[in-house]
């Protein structure tokens, strides 16, 4: 899992054809950062949790349980099968990584 600031994510972490769509989606209220979850991250057994996230719904439920202002981002074509959540508070994104690890 990693947290990437919003502008860097738009420039370097998503395909170029997704950039404009995501900029338009959050035009009025851009998020501060993005939580990027790779397949390796979600399939790893995690310390006190003792289990992996086998489905997107399971991980989304864990993120929602933190009660931070976050929402998932779905890309039209993500060949790397990464999962993304945007956060409007960068500190909450970092706390989410710590609490989910």
Question: What residue ranges belong to the model's regions?
Answer:
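The feature represents the first ordered module of a protein
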Residues: 1-80
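Short, compact, well-ordered microdomains
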Residues: 71-101
